[in-house]
Regions:
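Conserved functional hotspots at enzyme active or ligand-binding sites that engage polyanionic ligands
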Residues: 1-126
Length: 126
């Protein structure tokens, strides 16, 4: 369904044997959503451990947003990556489960430094 005159981007299907890794960033369709949850088609970081990613059909992800607000919150971290279309903020207070069928495409993998920062932000949420 196109909205506001925008053409929806087509994504090739992910390979059935794809190995999802902690720190991977994927374009995901997080619809439907409710209330203040982050929804829509957006990038998200896989934060679940690799064993869980292998055995489960569900990933634990942190959504990203290009709306950079409250950047000083301890649960927010801004990413500047070549594989993201714009600077994007990890919203680490809102990790969520997402079925692998929601994955549209692989975008890239965070550096060790970036993933450490995301992990620190996640610790503030738990």
């Amino acid at each position: 369904m196109a909205t506001r005159g925008k053409k929806e981007k087509e994504y090739p299907p992910m390979p059935a044997n794809w190995m999802y890794k902690r720190g991977d960033v994927y374009m995901m369709d997080l619809n439907p959503y409710s209330g203040s949850e982050q929804g829509g088609v957006r990038p998200a970081i896989v934060v679940q451990n690799d064993d869980g990613n292998f055995y489960s059909n569900v990933l634990l992800v942190v959504p990203l947003t290009t709306q950079i607000k409250k950047r000083n919150m301890p649960t927010h971290f801004v990413l500047h990556n070549r594989f993201l279309s714009a600077p994007s903020m990890a919203i680490c207070e809102s990790p969520r489960p997402a079925d692998k069928s929601r994955v549209l495409s692989y975008l890239g993998h965070l550096s060790k430094y970036e993933m450490r920062q995301v992990s620190v932000c996640l610790q503030y949420s738990f």
